């Protein structure tokens, strides 16, 4: 596993689940990891993000994990308000842009950097109905990953993306799982090659791979960590 001693990491969306597991994994491998959530820093606000970077200093590893459906599930497209749309797009995509823009200058000066964006299987293919903004923002995050990887590779900065499958990582995913009932839960697990749901640690292990020195020739990639669900 990678040795990240001396590296400084910033992880967004760390109140629980995947974000918290990523912080723990980075620290376990030697990095100094700073986790933030919406209660401490609004990562869609350039001023707040700039202030955070000023306090922390140069960032070697950025993990853009902030996001979520913001309670918007099962809405017909005609019922999605402008405010609803922007809330989800800002939380998932704008935050990725704002944080990436903030850390890149120091990464360029250092001649090295690792950026990992946490997208979703919903950004790669059709998912639940009624999550139009979330799926669109996550697809946009994948596009942003590829564009910035192409732009920043010459500076020693890699940009990659992880698309998690079904992970019981927060109250929203737990409620979603419970809403399926026993039959629906069995059907979902049967569509996963490994026949189990994911854990936050599964996603954190993918981040460790992309953050490692050994992954310096891997950039612009989207890694599905979904137990093989995407192959069905």
Predicted feature residues:
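The beta1-alpha1 cofactor-binding region of Rossmann-like NAD(H)/NADP(H)-dependent oxidoreductases
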Residues: 39-51, 82, 201-202
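Catalytic loop of short-chain dehydrogenase/reductase
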Residues: 69, 116-140, 145-154, 166-167
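Short C-terminal tail/terminal secondary-structure segment
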Residues: 207-208, 219-232
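Substrate-binding pocket helix/loop in short-chain dehydrogenase/reductase
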Residues: 73-77, 81-89, 177, 188
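A short, exposed helix-loop element centered on a Lys and neighboring polar residues
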Residues: 100-101, 146
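A glycine/serine/threonine-rich, flexible loop-to-helix segment
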Residues: 166-192
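Short, small/polar-rich loop/turn modules that mediate ligand/substrate recognition or access, typified
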Residues: 153, 158, 163, 218-220
């Amino acid at each position: 596993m990678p040795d990240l001693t001396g590296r400084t990491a910033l992880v967004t969306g760390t109140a629980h689940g995947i974000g918290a597991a990523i912080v723990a994994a980075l620290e376990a491998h030697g990095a100094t990891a700073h986790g933030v959530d919406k209660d401490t820093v609004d990562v869609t606000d350039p001023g707040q993000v700039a202030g955070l970077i000023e306090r922390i200093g140069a960032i070697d590893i950025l993990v853009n994990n902030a996001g979520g459906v913001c309670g918007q599930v099962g809405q017909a497209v005609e019922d999605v308000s402008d405010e609803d749309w922007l809330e989800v797009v800002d939380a998932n995509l704008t935050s990725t842009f704002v944080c990436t823009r903030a850390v890149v200058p120091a990464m360029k000066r250092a001649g090295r950097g690792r950026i990992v964006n946490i997208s979703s299987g919903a950004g790669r293919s059709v998912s639940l109905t009624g999550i139009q903004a979330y799926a669109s923002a996550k697809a946009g995050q994948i596009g942003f990953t590829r564009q910035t990887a192409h732009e920043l590779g010459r500076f020693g900065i890699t940009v990659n993306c992880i698309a998690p499958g079904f992970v019981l990582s927060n109250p929203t995913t737990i409620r979603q799982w419970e809403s399926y009932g026993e039959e629906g839960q069995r059907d979902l697990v049967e569509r996963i090659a490994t026949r189990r749901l994911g854990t936050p640690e599964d996603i954190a292990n993918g981040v460790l791979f992309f953050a490692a020195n050994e992954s310096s020739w891997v950039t612009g990639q989207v890694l599905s960590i979904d137990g093989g669900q995407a192959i069905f």
